[in-house]
Amino acid sequence: MGASEHVPPITSKAEFQEKVLNAKGFVVVDCFATWCGPCKAIAPTVEKFAQTYTDASFYQIDVDELSEVAAELGIRAMPTFLLFKDGQKVSDVVGANPGALEAGIKALLA
């Protein structure tokens, strides 16, 4: 995996609070694990979406590094994409499904 400039990592609970829960606007959170093959497979697509849908902020959470946050969010499978508007989760997409993720992002920004 590895973070990119378009999909930076969130590395603490406080940072998650600041960048996601306290954020105004649209946020997409990619919950992944370094050992997750499908997470690696969809990573370039997530990067592309982050560059395409610039009205949303994109972040990554390593569920093993931030297990407490992942548990609070109810993450049970990777990848899981959480879509937030003004700090409230409005939907999620479970699995490495580019079509479903793009549809979710478009609905979020509509």
Swiss-Prot record:
Statement: the UniProt record of this protein carries the keyword Disulfide bond: yes
InterPro entries: Thioredoxin, Thioredoxin-like_sf, Thioredoxin_CS, Thioredoxin_domain
Xref: CDD domains: TRX_family
Active-site residues per Swiss-Prot or TrEMBL entry: C36 (nucleophile), C39 (nucleophile)
Site, Deprotonates C-terminal active site Cys: residue positions: D30
Record site feature (Contributes to redox potential value), residues: G37, P38
Pfam families, per database record: Thioredoxin
Alphabetized UniProt keyword annotations: Disulfide bond, Electron transport, Redox-active center, Transport
PANTHER family: THIOREDOXIN-LIKE PROTEIN 1
NCBIfam families registered for this protein in UniProt: thioredoxin (TIGR01068)
Function of the molecule: Participates in various redox reactions through the reversible oxidation of its active center dithiol to a disulfide and catalyzes dithiol-disulfide exchange reactions.
Protein name as catalogued: Thioredoxin
Organism name: Emericella nidulans (strain FGSC A4 / ATCC 38163 / CBS 112.46 / NRRL 194 / M139) (Aspergillus nidulans)
